[in-house]
Amino acid sequence: MAVQESAAQLSMALKVQEYPTLKVPYETLNKRFRAAQKNIDRETSHVTMVVAELEKTLSSCSAVDSVVSLLDGVVEKLSVLKRKAMESIQAEDESAKLCKRRIEHLKEHSSDQTAAINMWKKKRMDRMMVEHLLRCGYYNTAVKLARQSEIEDLVNIEMFLTAKEVEESLERQETMTCLAWCHDNKSRLRKMKSCLEFSLRIQEFIELIRQNKRLDAVRHARKHFSQAEGSQLDEVRQVMGMLAFPSDTHISPYKDLLDPARWRMLIQQFRYDNYRLHQLGNNSVFTITLQAGLSAIKTPQCYKEDGTSKNPDCPVCSKSLNKLAQPLPLAHCANSRLVCKISGDVMNENNPPMMLPNGYVYGYNSLLSIRQDDKVVCPRTKEVFNFSQAEKVYIM
């Protein structure tokens, strides 16, 4: 029964933590399928048009040269259709194989062999680290780790490298790469009600004002802001006011609009929409897992100022993780467990808690191990007591 419960808990943890592992390649497959459908429909319509023109020419008994020319056109269109279909099918097949590979990898956690399970856990940890490094911008390190661990097909490197190109272009104060990304994901972004493309167009308008190209700014506004409504219309009205002020104005809000820090806001907005597009959380799985683990073992003893109650084997008590765990909730414990300060063993009926006259409690077995000539020395205060002075503690 306990084994089944443990397996069920592991299965639930996989569903929660490994969602991005399958969701990202699935979304890529879905996107490629829709693109293939559009490409094939478009090329099929081209073939239909030239075939109809050929049939019309044949019915009118035209010259042989005209028929041959039209036949060449039909062959050309069919060749293009075949090439586009093969390219689309190959791209879909690659995405489908990637989904299958990741499903097979996740199934390995239920292996009966201990060595296989340990290897799977190692790969899982490496996957978490790669994703975390990618989110933090350490792309080269992440790629090297993925290659060294042979998990390149189990992590979403391509997605993050694409995002890297977009973010770097925004850092250079360029919008074309990000606008191309918006165009590639236009339908999904529209369903998400994303304002990223609108924000980019606003920034382009601001840059034209900064360069004193006011007529170009007006043309830009007519082209891209004519359909604005609601809150977007209010923003358009605000930026249009910049036409009446110099580019070095100190009047608010135009001074804020001209602040180069807006590019950093665009990067954050792109990152947020990119995560939403692939249904990823704002934090990496590694961060979430680490925080959950720290919270599960965090106790008030980890933050005692005197430092005497800290356990050297406790991750939360360690200097590197103590500050990180500070804002996290304490561990939920329905049934308290008393742990001996000396040995680290649980104090129970086989190792009852014993209280010395100074109020400190230790396990009976630990007091026996440090007893000398019927005397015990308190490890905390260095006070010496008779062993018979230790009293048994009862927990109600």
Swiss-Prot record:
EC id: 2.3.2.27
CDD domains: RING-Ubox_Emp
UniProt-annotated location(s): Nucleus matrix; Cell membrane; Cytoplasm, Cytoskeleton
Domain LisH: 121-153
Any single Pfam family the record assigns to this protein: CTLH
GO terms assigned for molecular function: actin binding; ubiquitin protein ligase activity; zinc ion binding
Catalytic activity entry: S-ubiquitinyl-[E2 ubiquitin-conjugating enzyme]-L-cysteine + [acceptor protein]-L-lysine = [E2 ubiquitin-conjugating enzyme]-L-cysteine + N(6)-ubiquitinyl-[acceptor protein]-L-lysine
PROSITE patterns: CTLH (PS50897), LISH (PS50896), ZF_RING_GID (PS51867)
InterPro entries: CRA_dom, CTLH/CRA, CTLH_C, Fyv10_fam, LisH, ZF_RING_GID
Cell membrane in keyword set: yes
Cellular compartments per GO CC: cytoplasm; cytoskeleton; GID complex; nuclear matrix; nucleoplasm; nucleus; plasma membrane
Keywords, in A-Z order: Actin-binding, Cell cycle, Cell division, Cell membrane, Cytoplasm, Cytoskeleton, Erythrocyte maturation, Membrane, Metal-binding, Nucleus, Transferase, Ubl conjugation pathway, Zinc, Zinc-finger
UniProt entry tagged with the keyword Lipoprotein: no
PANTHER family attached to this UniProt entry: E3 UBIQUITIN-PROTEIN TRANSFERASE MAEA (PTHR12170:SF2), MACROPHAGE ERYTHROBLAST ATTACHER-RELATED (PTHR12170)
Domain notes: The expected RING-type zinc finger domain is highly divergent and most of the expected Cys residues are not conserved. Still, the protein is required for CTLH complex E3 ubiquitin-protein transferase activity. In addition, the conserved Cys-314 in this highly divergent region is required for ubiquitination by the yeast GID complex, suggesting a direct role in catalyzing ubiquitination.
Name of the featured protein: E3 ubiquitin-protein transferase MAEA
